[in-house]
Amino acid sequence: EHGYLLNKYTGCKVWCVINNEECGYLCNKRRGGYYGYCYFWKLACYCQGARKSELWNYKTNKCDL
């Protein structure tokens, strides 16, 4: 699956500014994906190849920030 990483504590996307290194680490090492980067226009970490449960979903959005 591909999409924005989910912050499991807040229910929001994992936010970033320009830090591809952190997003890559979270995606590759912590979430089972193969490529992660900071999507600048959305200010959120995008991950390719992660499990569906690791990704933020608009329909099940629980972000209250």
From Swiss-Prot:
Residues 1-64 form the LCN-type CS-alpha/beta domain. It is found in: Secreted. CDD domains: neurotoxins_LC_scorpion. GO terms for molecular function: sodium channel inhibitor activity; toxin activity. Expressed by the venom gland. The keyword Cell wall biogenesis/degradation does not apply. One of its GO terms (biological process) is defense response. It comes from the Eukaryota. SUPFAM superfamilies: Scorpion toxin-like. One of its GO terms (cellular component) is extracellular region. The keyword rRNA-binding does not apply. Keywords: Disulfide bond, Ion channel impairing toxin, Neurotoxin, Secreted, Toxin, Voltage-gated sodium channel impairing toxin. PROSITE patterns: LCN_CSAB. Disulfide bonds join C12-C63, C16-C38, C23-C45, C27-C47. Its main location: secreted. Belongs to the long (4 C-C) scorpion toxin superfamily. Sodium channel inhibitor family. Has a toxic effect on insects and mammals and is capable of competing with anti-insect scorpion toxins for binding to the sodium channel (Nav) of insects. It also modulates the binding of alpha-type and beta-type anti-mammal scorpion toxins to the mammal sodium channel. It may act on both site 3 and site 4 of voltage-gated sodium channels. Has the structural arrangement of an alpha-helix connected to antiparallel beta-sheets by disulfide bonds (CS-alpha/beta). This is Toxin AaHIT4.
